[in-house]
């Protein structure tokens, strides 16, 4: 009797019984541990080779990214220039290129960097740098605002244009003459006026919380002149019309419960109509106010008080 030895079947990739490939790649003979070990070693080497190739591709991608230039942070600023020392030279816009990566976030920071590092002759007002004093008011990209509260537009593909407040006489560069503006502010008598005399100068004039709340949105004005410089009615009648800023302060004292001249204040503003009624409710003042106040509403309220005859 002749005994015939049969060959073992190929292990299945799924269950190890039947034809196929073990580990999904290489054939394995059931009952031969060495063959299975060799298949596992080959699969591990192939996986290691694939990982190495992916690492090389990542390295090449990183080199390509490093070779490409970084986005530029240099931005152009076009600043209005005019000097009384050279009256024959026409006003013009001068370009300065500033690296935003080495500068503060506000337009005032840019102007100070230009003055310190690029051109010491540039003239502009500034003081508090916190939106309190109103000194650095100017027109930035067509909008009247204070430079210390205006963030820099980080889009380096377009230039930022900085000019003086419109409809103001220019003293030099970004500095305008505010003499008439302050005279109009003074004309509304922006101080407490009393008919009842107090016993001593140190006597306090008490207010209820409700009376004090009526002053919110009025006393915060910083006299930056952005609203008046944006008002077409003020452009056309600068000598007669007091402008939004002065009228806002006038209403602040009309609304103050401690003041005893409210009726006289309203009547003085309404005389001749030009001081108060030249306002056409265009509301450019409200739109441009950097402190988010509403001078147009204050002017409208004073017109109503005058018409009703009861401030």
Curated annotation (Swiss-Prot):
Coiled coil: none
Subcellular location: Mitochondrion inner membrane
Domain 2Fe-2S ferredoxin-type: 77-168
Region entry Disordered, spans: 1-70
Organism: Oryza sativa subsp. japonica
Function recorded in the entry: Iron-sulfur protein (IP) subunit of succinate dehydrogenase (SDH) that is involved in complex II of the mitochondrial electron transport chain and is responsible for transferring electrons from succinate to ubiquinone (coenzyme Q).
Family to which this protein belongs: Belongs to the succinate dehydrogenase/fumarate reductase iron-sulfur protein family.
Superkingdom: Eukaryota
Residue sites binding [3Fe-4S] cluster per the record: 231, 279, 285
Keyword vocabulary terms for this entry: 2Fe-2S, 3Fe-4S, 4Fe-4S, Electron transport, Iron, Iron-sulfur, Membrane, Metal-binding, Mitochondrion, Mitochondrion inner membrane, Oxidoreductase, Transit peptide, Transport, Tricarboxylic acid cycle
Biased composition (Basic and acidic residues): 51-63
Transit peptide: 1-63
Gene Ontology molecular function terms on file: 2 iron, 2 sulfur cluster binding; 3 iron, 4 sulfur cluster binding; 4 iron, 4 sulfur cluster binding; electron transfer activity; metal ion binding; succinate dehydrogenase (quinone) activity
Residue sites binding a ubiquinone per the record: 236
Record EC number: 1.3.5.1
Residues involved in [4Fe-4S] cluster binding: 221, 224, 227, 289
Name of the featured protein: Succinate dehydrogenase [ubiquinone] iron-sulfur subunit 2, mitochondrial
One BP annotation, GO: respiratory electron transport chain
EC category name: oxidoreductase
Reaction equations catalysed: a quinone + succinate = fumarate + a quinol
Pathway: Carbohydrate metabolism; tricarboxylic acid cycle; fumarate from succinate (eukaryal route): step 1/1
InterPro entries: 2Fe-2S_ferredoxin-like_sf (IPR036010), 2Fe2S_fd_BS (IPR006058), 4Fe4S_Fe-S-bd (IPR017896), 4Fe4S_Fe_S_CS (IPR017900), Beta-grasp_dom_sf (IPR012675), Helical_ferredxn (IPR009051), SDH/FRD_Iron-Sulfur (IPR050573), Succ_DH/fum_Rdtase_Fe-S (IPR004489)
Pfam families: Fer2_3, Fer4_8
């Amino acid at each position: 009797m002749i005994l015939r030895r049969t060959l073992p079947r190929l292990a299945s990739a799924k269950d190890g019984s039947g034809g196929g490939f073990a580990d999904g790649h290489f054939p394995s003979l059931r009952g031969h541990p060495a063959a299975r070990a060799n298949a596992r070693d080959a699969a591990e080497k192939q996986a290691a080779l694939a990982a190495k190739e992916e690492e090389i591709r990542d390295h090449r991608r990183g080199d390509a990214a490093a070779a490409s230039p970084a986005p530029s942070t240099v931005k152009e600023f076009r600043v209005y220039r005019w000097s009384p020392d050279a009256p024959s030279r026409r006003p013009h816009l001068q370009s300065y290129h500033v690296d935003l990566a080495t500068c503060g976030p506000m337009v005032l920071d840019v102007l100070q960097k230009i003055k310190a590092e690029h051109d010491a002759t540039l003239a502009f007002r500034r003081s508090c740098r916190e939106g309190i004093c109103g000194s650095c008011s100017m027109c930035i990209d067509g909008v009247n605002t204070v430079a210390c509260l205006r963030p820099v537009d980080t889009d380096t593909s377009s230039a930022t244009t900085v000019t003086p407040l419109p409809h103001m006489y220019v003293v030099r560069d970004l500095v305008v003459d505010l003499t008439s503006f302050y005279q109009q502010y003074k004309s509304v008598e922006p101080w407490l006026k009393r008919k009842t005399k107090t016993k001593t100068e140190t006597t306090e004039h008490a207010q209820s919380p409700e009376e004090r709340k009526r002053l919110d949105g009025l006393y915060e004005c910083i006299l930056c002149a952005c609203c008046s410089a944006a008002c077409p009615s003020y452009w056309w009648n600068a000598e007669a019309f007091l402008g939004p800023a002065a009228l806002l302060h006038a209403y602040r004292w009309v609304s103050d419960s401690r003041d005893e001249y409210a009726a006289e204040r309203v009547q003085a503003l309404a005389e001749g109509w030009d001081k108060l009624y030249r306002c056409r409710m265009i509301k450019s003042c409200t739109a441009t106010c950097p402190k988010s106040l509403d001078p147009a509403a204050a002017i409208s309220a004073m017109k109503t008080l005058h018409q009703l005859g009861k401030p």
